[in-house]
Amino acid sequence: MWRNGIVYRAVKNFVRHNSTNNAAKNLKSIKVEDIQNRIENIPIENYRNFSIVAHIDHGKSTLSDRLLEITGVISKTEGTSGQRVLDKLEVEKERGITIKAQTCSMIYNDKRNGQDFLLHLIDTPGHVDFRDEVSRSYKACNGAILLVDASKGVQSQTVANFYLAYSMGLKLIPVINKIDLNVAEVEKTAGQIESTFEMSQDEIIKVSSKSGINIQEKLLPAVIDRIPPPTGIKNKPFRALLVDSWYDSYLGVVLLVHVVDGSIKKGDKISSAITQMKYEIKEIGIMHPDRVNTGKLTTGQVGYIVPGMKNSQDAKIGDTFMKVGLESQTEILPGFEETKPMVFVGAFPADGVEFKALDDDINRLVLNDKSVTIEMENSNALGQGWRLGFLGSLHASVFKERLEKEYGSQLIITQPTVPYLIEYEDGTIKEVTNPNEFPTNRKAKGVKSIANVQEPYVEAIMTLPDEYLGNVITLCDNHRGKQVEIKYMDSGQSNAIKQVMLRYEIPLFELVDNFFGRLKSVSQGYATLDYEDIGFRPSDIVKLELLINGTTIDAITSILHRSKVNKVGTEWVKNFKKYVKSQQYEVVIQARINNSKIIARETIKARRKDVLAKLHASDITRRKKLLVKQKEGKKKLKMRSIGNIQINTDAYQEFLRR
């Protein structure tokens, strides 16, 4: 049945992010030699490397499926089944979002002139947490489709990703999608595109990704005509940009690269500009949409390399790969930056979950998500666990969901925090990502004096109907936001609902503390949000702790702005009281700031045990002895129980989940 060994290995070894059965069926019909021959005969002038820029749910993945179908990469049945071919993760399909950047090479015959074109589509994430994925993908592109839903209009992620793509010099093609919906407002959306992005309405292409209207007739010709080809030089030494990587249990680390100059083939040796490590290429080819071994890659192409790399941490996204021996003749590509986590949580096994098994599951998941950082952590309340760093709150949520769905593992997650910079008067700076490490006793002998504490800020972009403007402004003000810009997006139609774009500078911590949920609530679900990092700023930051009988519960500790601590501290003690059962002695629950000042308190009175119940009423001597013994026992019990109140793990889980 499988006579072509290359095709067999491609199917057998392909396990990237839960590949589908449909993908395997499609590979059966692929003749690798035909693909190789057609690509060989396509000049670089006929290459088009492009991406799709869109807000979540505007139809980006559906458009990708339709392009794959029209170019013959997948069958019509696969393209219309709603399987979202380039979204490999189960959580991507369930949430309707793209998390990992994916790519697919398509060979398209232009009926206007009969020429073949090699189209490299890179399907990027839209959410701000995965902005690094987006910017890396854009570096491999020369253009992008700016996709806007006709029923929703221009929204925040569209705006943010437009400016990112524009700043990187990509040629943008404005496209209005879902024009066949009954609620589509095509002309209004066209007016918004014109006023927001200063694009002529004559440039706009109107399509339906679902039904395929105008995809082949107008969109694909526009990709060919408007997006320029790659500008690399074939006879220069090989160099390639590392766009993405993933871990394959058979092959090790697989690299997704954009060949900027030169060419490379199986058996060649390459080296990393960042790690200086050298590798021999075991397999090389294109994604179609799964791995197809073509034996080589050349200038302008986007494809995969299997280098025999064992450790996924050695794959530095944005790295430059060169041929061994030609490093001195090869210019390193600019712009490499290590991915930096901006949201941190404590993670602990839920009740009944084995630590070792969960540790193995977390490390397996991190093999395909190098942006997650891991450190071991111990808690007096929850035991041994981990401190995990993520790109954002959605990233953390997706990681937890993947852990539960793919491995069946349950976690207790502490309140998220962000990195803070502690600047000391001697000029040294320390970054703190764990609330328990935040310095409190700043005047103690031998402790370095603190000059200031800085917290990260972001510029938030929100789009919303103007009827909710007052609610959203109030929300932003309550979250320490500073208004930068308010702009009405003119649609050119007098009877249309006016859309407003707001720009605010807001502390990042305020956003990760359920800001998006509150934004949706005050706008009845109509507001959208995107944001970008704008650096650190001095702020009045303190440490808030929860104490039981004078002992800190380290799992319930946070770093907050001083203006928030009284409200949060009062909520903490009232809520936590619900989960502590009465004891044979008084239990005191307190909230404390900076290891010194108590700002809130709740008391659970002692539960009295009737030790006299079984005694005869006239046995006075015995009664007195038992009462004295009970009193002494309470003293001893209370001494043993300070900081050791028996609280079920479920109580912490419920408290932290609220």
From Swiss-Prot:
Domain tr-type G, by residue range, is: 45-231
Q: What biological function has been recorded for the protein in this entry?
A: Promotes mitochondrial protein synthesis. May act as a fidelity factor of the translation reaction, by catalyzing a one-codon backward translocation of tRNAs on improperly translocated ribosomes. Binds to mitochondrial ribosomes in a GTP-dependent manner.
Chief subcellular location: mitochondrion
Assigned EC number: 3.6.5.-
Name the PANTHER family for this protein. Answer: TRANSLATION FACTOR GUF1, MITOCHONDRIAL, TRANSLATION FACTOR GUF1-RELATED
Q: Which InterPro entries match?
A: EF-4, EFG_III/V, EFG_V-like, G_TR_CS, LepA_C_sf, LepA_CTD, LepA_IV, P-loop_NTPase
The remark listed among the other comments is:
This protein may be expected to contain an N-terminal transit peptide but none has been predicted.
Q: Binding positions for GTP?
A: 54-61, 123-127, 177-180
Q: Which GO terms describe its cellular component?
A: mitochondrial inner membrane; mitochondrial matrix
- Is this entry keyworded Mitochondrion? yes
Q: How does the entry describe its membrane topology?
A: Peripheral membrane protein
User: What name has this protein been given in UniProt?
Assistant: Translation factor GUF1, mitochondrial
Q: Which reaction does it catalyse?
A: GTP + H2O = GDP + phosphate + H(+)
Encoding gene, per UniProt annotation: GUF1
Cellular location of this protein?
Mitochondrion inner membrane
> Lineage in the entry?
Eukaryota, Fungi, Dikarya, Ascomycota, Saccharomycotina
Which organism's genome codes for this protein?
Vanderwaltozyma polyspora (strain ATCC 22028 / DSM 70294 / BCRC 21397 / CBS 2163 / NBRC 10782 / NRRL Y-8283 / UCD 57-17) (Kluyveromyces polysporus)
**Is the keyword Hydrolase assigned to this protein?**
yes
